[in-house]
Each structure stands twice: as structure tokens, then as C-alpha cells.
């Protein structure tokens, strides 16, 4: 009898507690942002499909710019408006400063030493300071100009060799390898691989696989039930394998440096030396795994050039653009863009052609329009006929001739500050003259995490909810952009939009404390590499494929890229 009373008491207690918690959940749920009805266990995962960025944008049209989803059992708030993004990432920056850490990133304790995943604490500030002072500071980047020139020259030489042999260039592999070795020389003072060999392809695939596995757990790995501990999808197993390979490579380089520290001239200190020196000063040995994890965080960076350059070269071919030596402003002949070569210098970097430096044209306005106008979204671009080309040329002739001349100094070199502040952007690499709003090939979604329950635009957001800011949806918001999918560069001519996290219509690098530290490197490397490729060659698709028949399927992940490699045949100018 006593057992029966105990069981009844326990049941009554459970029923009471469960009822109170249910009432609390209902009260909270009424104050949550609107969203679709979740299914048991999986929540709203079934609504995401193969292209979550597109699915979320469509759902936002139904449920509004701030939307509540359940990914598995995790409450997820999706932001698809620049106004709400400003509230989250600027006005409440500290609250939203922590990343949502995917479960698989904890393998090999990587999340404990990576400035990408660490919460905002003293360790994160130290690592961020090292990155900013040793890699991404203006003085450091300007001092490495010779290294960028060397790596771009190697890229041009490789394309020249392919042109001579009539071979196609895998643009993604070539630009990845070039930037990989630029980064590895900055960190380790040596090349990691031959940028045009199969080893570069393997390294690229290794880095990409790490990014993909980390991204999968944001959606498919969120099912909160016991089987998750057994890794039924094999994500943890694969990630452990990838990290073991990557950390083994980096750890080997660290051990090699430790052995040669006493013999090596440290006049030109690199990033690894900076880490080791900090370790020595603090009397704490920076173990191999910690150093490796810090450095592994940097290696998604080489994907940025090929994500940007591949689509632009495709669109260059698609619109039959051509760079030629002409006098005057430049013109459009037979649907082709033709430019002259008045000197242009992007900061310390000069564009390269063949085996010598080559300055670019005074009608950089035309090149700028191609660069910024064609670089972005492949799927919805609507600029394909000669009438549109003629219209753009007419607008350029009226609008940009005066603008360009204002920024050319007496030496006929365009100054970096004026050039970049008035023309270039990166991520959706365009700052002012974006023909299509951001997000085409930049990070389509990024994740932050609430530290406490708080209010946002009248809604209650529970503590530890996941927050997704949909850059892709913001960039295609018809309330924000008139005809957002139409090629219309003139929409930005009078715009003051900036990419440094102040204007939330364009945040390809994020905003607030967690804004990407690689922006200074990006705005130096991408224009020079891309400009040199265009300044040296004409390009056509491999295999006689018509541009309209090219497979333009997207590869969804932390960044958006072409699923199939872009193969193009260069022809020297």
C-alpha cells in the first residue's frame, strides 16, 4: 500500500510540474515571433529542403521579417530584415556576440581555441588581436604587397601556360591555391602546396569538407533524441578524420618552427612566430593542438577568391566582355566591353599581365561596372542582350566619366582609399554599384546566440535560442531594393551604403564584435587577382558549352558557390 501511495504521489507531482511547465511554455509561445507549425521531434526541418537560404526567404514572406522555427527541438529565430538585423547586431551587440557552436566543432577541442567559435572572452580577444595585428592590419598587408604580386604573377603564368597549350583553367582550384599559399606564406613563411597540382585540390576539398560538416549540424544534426549521441549520420566521425589530417599538417609545421627558432632570422616575423612569442612572454607553452586550432580557423579564407572570381568570369563570358587597348574612354563594340589602359593602382598593388606589371584603364568605370555588376548572383541576373548593354554604356558615359576623373591623381594612379570607398566592395564584392543586392556568393546565413531571455520588437526570445540572420533574404527584399533581381547598377550611384557593418542592407562580412576580420585582405587581394586575370586574357567556356547551358547549380554551405567547377579557356590579349 505504501508503494501505491508513493507512486501516486510521484505521479501527482509529475503531473503538477508538467502542467505548470506546459502553461509556462504556452505563455512564452504566445510571445514568440510567428512561424510555421512544427512537427513532433523534427520541428520545421522538413521545410528547409536542399537550399535552406531560399526556403527561409520564402517562409519569411509568409511569416514576416522575424520568424520562429523549431529545428529539431531548438527554437530558432530567423531575421530577414535589415531593420531587425540592426536591432540584433548593433543595438544589442554584446547580447548577440556569441556564436552558436555546432556540435561537431567540439571534436579535438577545436571550439575551445578557435576565434571563430569562442565566446567573447579574454582568450577570444587575445586571438582576435593577434589576427588583426599580425595578418589583417593595414601596415602588415601593405608590407606584404610584394608577396601578393608574386602569387598573382604565378597565377597569371599558369594561365599563360594553359593558354599556350589550349588547356582549360579550373578557376576555383587556381584561385584557391593562389590564396592558400598567400595565406600560408603570411602564417608560416612557406607554400603549403603547389597551387595548381592535385595536392591543392585535395587540400581545398579537405577545407571545404570541414566547412560542410560544420554547417550540416546547423540543420540536419539538430534532432534532440538519444540516437544523436551515437552519431547516426557519421558527421562526428568524418569531422574527426578531417580535423586529424588538418591538425596533423599544422602541428608538423609548428614542430618544424620550434626546432629552427634559434637559427631563423626573425626580422620578418610571421603569424606563427607571433603566437609562439606570446606563449613565451606569458610563460605558458602554446601546445601544438592549441596553436593548430587557432590557425585552422584561418583556412576557409582561400575560398573567398574562387567564390567571387568563378561567377564573375562566367558572367564575363556570358556577356562577351572584352578588354582591349583603346584610346579614350572605352566603348562597347558588338556587345563587347572595350577598355583602354590609363594607369591604375589599387593601393600598393598593380594589376599584372603576362610577365610584367600592367596598369589598368581610365575607363575603369566600365571595368568597375562589369566587376561589380556581374560578379554576383548567377540564377536571376537579367542582363543578356545588346539593348541593355547599350543602355548601361549610355549611363556610364554620362555618370562615371566625371566621377573617375575626380579620383585620378596627377600621376594617373587611382588612390586606394578613394577607389575602394567609392567603388569596390567584397562579399557580394560590391559596395556602391551593386547590380544585385548582397548575398549571392557571400555567407548566406550566419548564426548568433542569445545570452538571456529578452525582448525584440515586441517578441520574447528565450535564452539560448539560435538566431539566423539571412543575408541572402535581406539582399533580395523587394521592400528594400526596387526590382532586386534586375541588373541595375545605377541604383547605387548616389548611395552611401558601406560594407563595414554600419549599413545593414549590405552585411556580407557580418557586423558588430563578430564582423569578419579578413575584410582588409579581401579588398586588396580580390580586385588585383581578378583584375589581372581580366587584364591578361579573354575567356571562353570549355568544351564549346553555351553560357545558357552551363550548370549553375549552387552548393549550399557557410558560403554559396558553384556546385560544379568553372572551366574556362584563356586567350592572351
From Swiss-Prot:
Disulfide bonds: none annotated. SUPFAM superfamilies: Cytochrome P450 (SSF48264). It is found in: Endoplasmic reticulum membrane. Pathway: Lipid metabolism; fatty acid metabolism. Heme binds at residue 516. Mostly expressed in flowers and leaves and, at low levels, in roots and stems. Gene3D superfamilies: Cytochrome P450 (1.10.630.10). One of its GO terms (molecular function) is fatty acid omega-hydroxylase activity. Keywords: Endoplasmic reticulum, Heme, Iron, Lipid metabolism, Membrane, Metal-binding, Monooxygenase, Oxidoreductase, Transmembrane, Transmembrane helix. One of its GO terms (cellular component) is endoplasmic reticulum membrane. The chain crosses the membrane at residues 3-23, 298-318. Cytochrome P450 hydroxylase catalyzing the conversion of decanoate (capric acid) and dodecanoate (lauric acid) to their corresponding omega-hydroxy metabolites, 10-hydroxydecanoate and 12-hydroxydodecanoate, respectively; these hydroxylated components affect plant growth, including reducing root elongation. This is Lauric acid 10-hydroxylase. It comes from Petunia hybrida.
Amino acid at each position: 500500500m505504501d508503494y501505491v501511495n508513493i507512486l501516486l504521489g510521484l505521479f501527482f507531482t509529475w503531473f503538477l510540474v508538467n502542467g505548470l511547465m506546459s502553461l509556462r511554455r504556452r505563455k512564452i509561445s504566445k510571445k514568440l515571433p510567428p512561424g510555421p507549425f512544427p512537427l513532433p521531434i523534427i520541428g520545421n526541418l522538413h521545410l528547409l529542403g536542399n537550399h535552406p537560404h531560399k526556403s527561409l526567404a520564402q517562409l519569411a514572406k509568409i511569416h514576416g521579417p522575424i520568424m520562429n522555427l523549431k529545428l529539431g527541438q531548438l527554437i530558432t529565430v530567423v531575421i530577414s530584415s535589415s531593420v531587425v538585423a540592426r536591432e540584433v547586431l548593433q543595438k544589442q551587440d554584446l547580447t548577440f556576440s556569441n556564436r552558436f557552436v555546432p556540435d561537431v566543432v567540439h571534436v579535438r577541442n577545436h571550439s575551445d581555441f578557435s576565434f571563430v567559435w569562442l565566446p567573447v572572452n579574454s582568450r577570444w580577444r587575445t586571438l582576435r588581436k593577434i589576427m588583426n595585428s599580425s595578418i589583417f592590419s593595414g601596415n602588415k598587408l601593405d608590407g606584404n604587397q610584394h608577396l601578393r604580386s608574386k602569387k598573382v604573377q604565378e597565377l597569371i603564368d599558369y594561365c599563360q601556360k594553359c593558354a599556350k597549350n589550349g588547356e582549360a583553367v579550373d578557376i576555383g582550384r587556381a584561385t584557391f591555391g593562389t590564396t592558400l599559399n598567400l595565406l600560408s606564406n603570411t602564417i608560416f613563411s612557406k607554400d603549403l602546396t603547389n597551387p595548381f597540382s592535385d595536392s591543392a585540390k585535395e587540400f581545398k576539398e579537405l577545407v571545404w569538407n570541414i566547412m560542410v560538416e560544420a554547417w550540416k549540424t546547423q540543420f540536419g544534426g539538430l534532432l534532440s533524441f538519444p540516437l544523436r549521441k551515437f552519431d547516426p549520420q557519421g558527421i562526428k566521425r568524418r569531422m574527426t578524420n578531417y580535423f586529424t589530417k588538418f591538425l596533423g599538417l599544422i602541428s608538423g609545421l609548428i614542430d618544424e618552427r620550434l626546432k629552427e627558432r634559434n637559427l631563423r632570422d626573425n626580422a620578418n616575423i610571421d603569424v606563427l612566430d607571433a603566437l609562439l612569442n606570446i606563449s613565451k612572454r606569458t610563460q605558458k607553452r602554446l601546445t601544438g593542438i592549441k596553436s593548430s586550432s587557432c590557425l585552422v580557423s584561418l583556412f576557409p579564407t582561400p575560398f573567398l577568391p574562387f567564390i567571387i572570381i568563378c561567377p564573375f568570369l562566367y558572367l564575363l563570358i556570358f556577356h562577351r566582355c572584352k578588354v582591349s587597348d583603346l584610346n579614350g574612354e572605352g566603348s562597347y563594340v558588338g556587345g563587347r566591353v572595350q577598355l583602354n589602359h590609363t594607369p591604375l593602382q589599387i593601393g600598393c598593388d598593380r594589376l599584372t599581365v603576362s610577365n610584367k606589371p600592367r596598369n589598368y584603364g581610365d575607363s575603369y568605370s566600365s571595368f568597375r561596372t562589369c566587376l561589380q555588376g556581374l560578379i554576383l548572383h548567377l540564377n536571376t541576373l537579367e542582363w543578356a542582350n545588346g539593348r541593355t548593354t547599350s543602355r548601361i554604356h549610355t549611363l556610364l558615359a554620362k555618370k562615371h566619366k566625371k566621377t573617375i576623373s575626380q579620383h585620378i591623381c596627377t600621376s594617373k594612379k587611382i588612390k586606394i582609399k578613394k577607389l575602394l570607398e567609392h567603388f569596390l566592395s567584397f562579399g557580394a564584392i560590391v559596395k556602391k554599384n551593386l547590380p544585385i543586392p548582397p548575398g549571392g556568393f557571400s555567407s548566406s546565413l550566419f548564426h548568433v546566440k542569445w545570452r538571456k531571455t529578452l525582448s525584440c520588437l515586441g517578441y520574447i526570445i528565450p535564452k539560448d535560442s539560435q538566431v539566423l540572420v539571412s543575408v541572402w533574404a535581406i539582399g533580395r527584399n523587394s521592400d528594400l531594393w526596387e526590382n532586386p533581381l534586375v541588373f541595375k547598377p545605377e541604383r547605387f550611384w548616389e548611395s552611401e551604403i558601406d560594407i563595414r557593418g554600419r549599413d545593414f542592407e549590405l552585411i556580407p562580412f557580418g557586423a558588430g564584435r563578430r564582423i569578419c576580420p579578413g575584410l582588409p585582405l579581401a579588398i586588396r587581394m580580390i580586385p588585383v587577382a581578378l583584375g589581372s586575370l581580366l587584364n591578361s586574357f579573354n575567356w571562353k567556356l570549355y568544351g564549346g558549352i553555351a553560357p545558357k547551358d552551363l550548370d549553375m547549380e549552387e552548393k549550399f554551405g557557410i558560403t554559396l558557390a558553384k556546385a560544379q567547377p568553372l572551366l574556362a579557356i584563356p586567350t592572351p590579349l
